[in-house]
Amino acid sequence: MMSKQLAAQVPAEPVVLGKMGSSYGIRGWLRVFSSTEDAESIFDYLPWFIQKAGQWQQVQLESWKHHNQDLIIKLKGVDDRDAANLLTNCEIVVDSSQLPALEEGDYYWKDLMGCQVVTAEGYDLGKVIDMMETGSNDVLVIKANLKDAFGIKERLVPFLDGQVIKKVDLATRTIEVDWDPGF
């Protein structure tokens, strides 16, 4: 059972850093999928929270290790496969105050999601629905508007600051780009 003190703490500004995968073994270990730039960085941001039945719960990381290509974790109080299975697909959440401050021109992916993307000429390319890592640079995945003049459903626009990305305004949730709407 959780103590009242832990139950009272909830993330003021929740940020999803990953999710728990399937159980591993019989002692309550779980695979973990990290969406941090460096997978192991997920362990730098504690405490973790999960939502179960609409309620926030703080979970305590007891241990973690590499297993083949996976990262596996052991949470305090999760001691068998059944308990671990209950956590499969739970998102791992931290409070945004745990994250490091960003430098000028850097953005968290979560802040770019849902932003409207427009060209310098004012053409509305659509909304950011996802981000991809390509190795050389990140790429915005933009869902085009239903009445897109070019009949495009989805656009991939490289997140190259200055070159393609002209202005990011998180207050108005818009990203101005130098990009040909035909692509």
Swiss-Prot record:
GO cellular component: cytoplasm; ribosome
Domain PRC barrel: 104-183
Pfam families documented for this protein: PRC_RimM, RimM
Xref: InterPro entries: PRC_barrel-like_sf (IPR011033), PRC_RimM (IPR056792), RimM (IPR011961), RimM_N (IPR002676), RimM_N_sf (IPR036976), Transl_B-barrel_sf (IPR009000)
Keywords for this protein: Chaperone, Cytoplasm, Ribosome biogenesis, rRNA processing
Listed SUPFAM superfamilies: PRC-barrel domain, Translation proteins
Any GO molecular function: ribosome binding
Subcellular location, record wording: Cytoplasm
Primary subcellular site in the record, as a coarse category: cytoplasm
Entry superkingdom: Bacteria
GO biological process: ribosomal small subunit biogenesis; rRNA processing
This protein's domain notes: The PRC barrel domain binds ribosomal protein uS19.
Function: An accessory protein needed during the final step in the assembly of 30S ribosomal subunit, possibly for assembly of the head region. Essential for efficient processing of 16S rRNA. May be needed both before and after RbfA during the maturation of 16S rRNA. It has affinity for free ribosomal 30S subunits but not for 70S ribosomes.
Record text on subunit structure and interactions: Binds ribosomal protein uS19.
Family under the similarity heading: Belongs to the RimM family.
Name of the molecule in the record: Ribosome maturation factor RimM
